[in-house]
């Protein structure tokens, strides 16, 4: 059986993305996307997303809180120890394609 790990999200940025750089000077950003649930008990899920390199720079330059965003990526789980030595785990979407999901706002950037 083949394995498949593909995620497609359409939602809104929960806050402005911020560009950081790794120790090797690789651009990266993490942000949350608010996505409405389907079904009777509708609610909102906040999905953590990571973008690297050109995608990270693109998102930080042209997207801001509240903007609609379309994301394609894959789910990644990672573990680490926090400063107190506790084991921590995160599940996030690593984006490989990010696009605008609504027309340009007045006064917004032209891309």
Where are the language model's segments positioned?
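Single-stranded nucleic acid-binding surfaces, predominantly the OB-fold ssDNA-binding core
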Residues: 1-111
């Amino acid at each position: 059986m083949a394995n498949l790990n593909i995620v497609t999200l359409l939602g809104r940025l929960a806050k402005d993305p911020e560009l950081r750089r790794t120790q090797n000077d690789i651009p990266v950003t993490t942000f949350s996307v608010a996505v409405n649930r389907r079904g009777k008990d509708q609610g909102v899920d906040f999905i953590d997303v990571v973008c690297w390199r050109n995608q990270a720079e693109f998102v930080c330059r042209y997207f801001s809180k509240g903007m609609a965003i379309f994301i394609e990526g894959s789910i990644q789980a990672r573990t680490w120890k926090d400063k107190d030595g506790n084991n921590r785990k995160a599940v996030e979407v690593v984006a490989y394609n990010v696009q605008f999901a609504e027309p340009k706002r007045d006064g917004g950037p032209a891309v």
